[in-house]
Amino acid sequence: AFRNDLMVRGGGPSENRFFLDGVEIPNINHFSTQGASGGPVGIINPDFIREVNFYSAAFPASKGNTLSSVLDFKLQDGNKEKFSLRGVLGASDIGVSANGPLGKKTTFQVSVRRSYLQFLFDMIGLPFLPTFTDAQFKIKHSFNPKNELTVLGLGAIDDMKLNTGMEDMSEKNQYILSYLPVVKQKTYTLGAVYKHYAGKNLYSVIISRSQTNNKNIKYKDNDESKEENLSLNYRSDEIENKFRTENTFRLPFIQLNVGGNIEYAQYTNDTYQKQFTSIPRTIVYQTDLGIWKWGIY
C-alpha cells in the first residue's frame, strides 16, 4: 500500500529501466524494496524535468535488455541569464533548489530536500519513524555549438527507526514493532554525457556509476542491550559501472542508430538471521559476485 510500483503488461516492478538525460539510474523512489523499483516517495525533483518518454514496447536499441518498460527523463538546463533560488515547504518535507550560469558557457541546477515525517508519524502514534533526504544536480558546459558535456548526479538516504517509546502501545502496534526491522538505505548515481553534433548526425558517449546500499537490523523484543538478542543483520551492496556509446545517423528516409555498451556490476551480501521456530536455527550467508555485460547494436 502507498507505493508507486510500476507494472507494465503483466510484468513485475523489477523489470523497468529508468534513464536521466541518457544516464541509467537504478531506482527513482525512496524506501524501495530491494530488487523492485517502487516506493512511497519519488527521488527526482519534478521541477527539473522537461519531458518524459515512456516506452511499453518497441524499446530503443540503445536501451536493450528491457523486459517491461523504459522511462526516459529529460532534464531542463540551468538558466543562462540569471541566478535563481527557490524554497519549498510541503506537507512532509522541506527543500531548496538553485540554478543559473557558471560563466558564459556553463549552467547548473541543484536541489536538496529533507523530510520531517518522523515528527508527524510520532504525533499521530505510528510505530515506525521514516526520514528521507535526497539531492540532485546537473552541470552543462558547451565547448562550442557542436560539442557539449553534461555531468549529473542523484542521491538519496532513507532511514526508518522504530517508535519504541510511543504512548499508545496497543496490541496492533506491539505486533508491528515485534517484526519490523530498522532500515537504512543509501543510493546514488553519477554520470557524464558527451555529445558531438555533426550536421544531422549525433555522437554520444555516456559513462556512469551507481551504488545502492541496504541495511536491515532487528533485535528480539527490540532490546539492543544484549548481543545475543540480535535476530537479523542484513547488509547488501550493489555497484554498477557503465560505458555506452550511441551514434545516430539521419539518412534520406531512414534513421540509423549504431552503438555499444560495456558494464561491470558487483553484488555483495552479508546476512545473519535467527529463526525462532519450533526448531530454532541460524542462517549465515555471504556472497561477492562480479558480472561483466556487453552489447552492440
Spans of model-derived segments:
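Short acidic/polar hinge/loop motifs at secondary-structure boundaries
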Residues: 24-54, 137
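Strand-connecting loop/turn motifs
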Residues: 15, 47, 80-82, 93, ...
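A beta-strand signature from Gram-negative outer-membrane beta-barrel systems
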Residues: 40-84, 95-97, 104
